[in-house]
Amino acid sequence: MDTIIMIPVATAIVSLLVGTVIGYAIRKHSWEQKVQNAQNDADHILADARAQVAAVKAEVNAQKQAAEAVKQSAENTKKEKILEAQEQIRDYKQKTEDKLNLKKDDLARQENRLKQREDTLDHKNSLLDEREAGLTKKEDQLKQQYTSLKAKLTEADELVEARRQKLYDVAKLDKEEAKKIVLNKLSDELVKERAELIRNSNEEVKAKADHYASQIIVDAIQSSAADTVAETTVSVVDLPNEEMKGRIIGREGRNIRSFEALTGIDLIIDDTPKVVTLSGFDPIRREIAKRAMERLIKDGRIHPARIEEMVDKARKEVNDDIYEAGESALMELGIHRMNPELVKTLGRLKYRTSYGQNVLSHSIEVGKLAGTMAAELGLDEKLAVRAGLLHDIGKAIDHDIEGSHVEIGVELTRKYHESDVVVNAIAAHHGDVPKLSFIAELVVAADTISSARPGARSESLENYIRRLTELEKIAKSYQGVKQAYAIQAGREVRVMVEPDEISDDRTVILARDIRNQVEKELDYPGNIKITVIREKRVVAIAK
């Protein structure tokens, strides 16, 4: 019974132990499972945390890289902006320096011009001072000479009286004879003093004026040149054959009559082969006739209606050429704003000659010379050029209007409102009225230079012979002149004097007197040189 009782107890104990063990095992397994789950959860959480940390790190790195990129971009942009700003600064600095250099160059050029002008003014002032000093010195010398001459005259009067008395007492001459001897002696002495004074004055004036005047004139002449033409009153037109003469004459000479009536030019048909001659004093009409005849010959149809048509065309063509010649002259001299009618009148000078010199070419040359000399003297160069160009404008229409070319030129320029200086230069260039300006003086000088240069002008044979004869006649009219010769086409007169009648001192006075008479009585182009030669030969024959 006890055993039976022990078995259940043992079983119960064993069961309890087994249950305890099993419960412990189950509980342990459960705890292990929970621990494992917790560990897994912790691993998951740690993995998630690590993933989040990695993501945050990646995001931080990305942001850091982005920040670095932004920073780098900002740095690059900053550098670019700095470089761009530096480039702009360099460009601005370079431009500023270039502008400053240009301004410096301009200022330097202006300074050089001002310095040159100042030097020129100083030079001119020096010349004026020298001239003033020379004039003052000359005035003092003249005063001294006047005082000396006055004293000499007083002394001469006393000497004359003393000699008169002495001659009267010693030679027993009457008063008139003694007076004649003394006056002849005194006249010889005064002639000697006068000749010496003339020589000294001429040398002094020449020494002071030659260099400066020559320099101005040479500069003016070197900058100018003009062609020369031969003066003529006929034009010759070539014909292709002799038959053309008959066609030009026409039935009963009607073509010639029509041509001459329309042109105002004589048509001469003679035995000269293959030419016809146009004769007339108006060069413009002659040019119109020549062009019309050349057109008719080329066309071949010659009858009054065709002649009238060709003359009208030639007249229009010549009028166009005249205006173009006037405009070309203005362009060559740089003259602007001139009345068209005055330009047309100026162009007519192309067909006008004076002593064989083309008047338009001469006027252009005078304008250049006057302008050059005006510039050298500090005067208005453009006004001088204008006055020089227009000084002979009256010659363009002096065949059509009554009056001298000077009067016509003055009236014409006043009509078209040219300045008073230009009008006075025209009026005074032949000495008809006083010169009221330095420019008028320059126009006269330029006109003389242009006319007097070799080859510029020629004369007709009749005028040439007459002028030479009158030159020799004037020279021979003086007492003591043995012979006189006009040489070098009348540009020099050589006067041979009797050595026993004319002294060396008196030759100076004789040359001066002949020059004054030539200037007063003769009209001539250029200058005439008067040369007085006194030669005494003594011959002794040894036997």
From Swiss-Prot:
Gene3D superfamilies: Hypothetical protein af1432 (1.10.3210.10), K Homology domain, type 1 (3.30.1370.10). Its EC number is 3.1.-.-. Residues 233-296 form the KH domain. Its main location: membrane. The keyword Nucleotide-binding does not apply. GO terms for molecular function: RNA binding; RNA endonuclease activity. The chain crosses the membrane at residues 4-24. It comes from the Bacteria. It is an enzyme of class 3 (hydrolase). It is found in: Cell membrane. Residues 359-452 form the HD domain. Belongs to the RNase Y family. Endoribonuclease that initiates mRNA decay. This is Ribonuclease Y. It comes from Lactobacillus helveticus (strain DPC 4571). The gene is rny.
